[in-house]
Amino acid sequence: EEKKKNSIRPLLASEIECRVGTMKPDGSGCSLLLYKDARVDMRILDEVFGEMNWKRHHDVVNGNLFCTLSIWDNEKKEWVSKQDVGTESSTEKEKGQASDAFKRAGFNWGIGRELYTGPFIWIPLEKNEVYQSKTGSPALYTKFSVKEIGYNEQKEIILLVIVDNKNRVRFAYGNTKEKVYAPNVSASNASGKVYTGVDLDRAIKQMTGVKSREELERVWAEHP
């Protein structure tokens, strides 16, 4: 069973979802996070272990919903289990929490763990891509998806291309010839300066190159 666990493949581009992580208050840019759908976990479990050789069980502990994901070990003739807790969904509370717990338990088995090795993803946005939500914060019309992804032997992400729903490349990482679409933006700072040409390119490169929240806040301060 250990060999089977090690044979769990990295996720395909079509199996990965892009969701907004953070967005600048003025809507001029956002970060993206890579996610997997619970159906991906089920598909890979069926592929690697077989439909009859895994099972899931949910328990409520201190008000939290846990998922126990068990795999049948044919050599030991016993079930081997890994568990994790889910977080609530903003829409369907119980269903979302159960799905999240299942996906987290799948992470513990190695399904989609490579998503944690990805680069920080920053997307500059155009004004017509953003609208004001009911809460008053900026929200996106544009949807993003993974066009291409590549891994090394350690199952770490070494190539990543993200496109929008108009099939324009909005982010590229690694050894790729894809040309990233340059949004028609003009970012003004407090003194009224407008970033264009070389200055705009430099600002965008700084945004797309950050790798931590602290670095992101520093770049935001430089290009408010």
PLM-predicted stretches and their roles:
Residues 1-30, 123-224:
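Interfaces that engage single-stranded nucleic acids at replication/repair/recombination sites
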Residues 40-183:
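Positively charged, aromatic-enriched nucleic acid-contacting surfaces
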Residues 22-34, 85-92:
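Short histidine-centered catalytic/ligand-binding loop motif
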Residues 1-6, 13, 28-53:
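OB-fold ssDNA-binding interfaces and closely related basic DNA-contact patches used
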